[in-house]
Regions:
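N-terminal basic/disordered segments at the start of proteins
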Residues: 6-44
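A short, well-structured beta->alpha microelement
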Residues: 8-13, 52-75
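Cofactor-cradling patches in redox/metallo enzymes
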Residues: 81-100
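Hydrophobic or amphipathic alpha-helical targeting/insertion segments
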Residues: 97-140
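Single conserved hydrophobic/aromatic residue that forms the stacking wall/gate
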Residues: 153-162
């Protein structure tokens, strides 16, 4: 008789830590989707004069807990607003969400966590620190997509907390 051993690991346990080396910015957008990040970059570049500074990062590079902790210390801790778009819900980046939420609570950073797959996910709403009305507006903008919608996000309204 043969015994088969199976090893169960989370995504973060199979990754190698990465330091993105990004400096702080007023706004930070994190997503697993390169098209999301490209749209935000394009929108920001069109109207960069007068806009807050912006950093973009693909969450693929932030799977390992050490990568998350380093990014929080070096980049996110200096942000005024953070937008995270997740495909698949909390379980796909749970450690990161918990750490970023804790940072946002401690430093008063406006945090919006949105689904990137077009589905409602009330669990993600619980990680956001901004008013529900602002969160709904951001969901509509990001679901619309394109650089114009992303430009509207990078032009935050002070009354909205971003």
């Amino acid at each position: 008789m043969h015994v088969v051993f199976r090893e169960a690991q989370g995504l973060e346990e199979t990754e190698i830590p990465i330091d993105l080396g990004q400096t702080p910015a007023d706004l930070v957008v994190l997503s697993f989707s390169d098209s999301d990040l490209g749209a935000f970059s394009e929108g920001w570049k069109k109207e960069r004069e007068g806009l807050p500074s912006l950093r973009l990062a693909n969450l693929v590079a932030l799977k390992h807990p050490t990568s998350v902790d380093t990014y929080i210390d070096q980049t996110l801790s200096g942000a005024k607003g953070i937008l995270i778009r997740l495909i698949g819900g909390v379980q796909y980046w749970e450690y990161g969400l918990n750490q970023v939420y804790q940072l946002a609570q401690e430093k008063g950073i406006a945090l919006a966590v949105l689904p990137a797959d077009g589905r409602e996910d009330t669990r993600l709403d619980e990680y956001s620190t901004i008013p529900k009305s602002t969160l709904q507006r951001l969901k509509k903008l990001t679901d619309t997509g394109g650089s114009k919608a992303c430009l509207l996000y990078t032009s935050p309204s002070p009354r909205d907390g971003l």
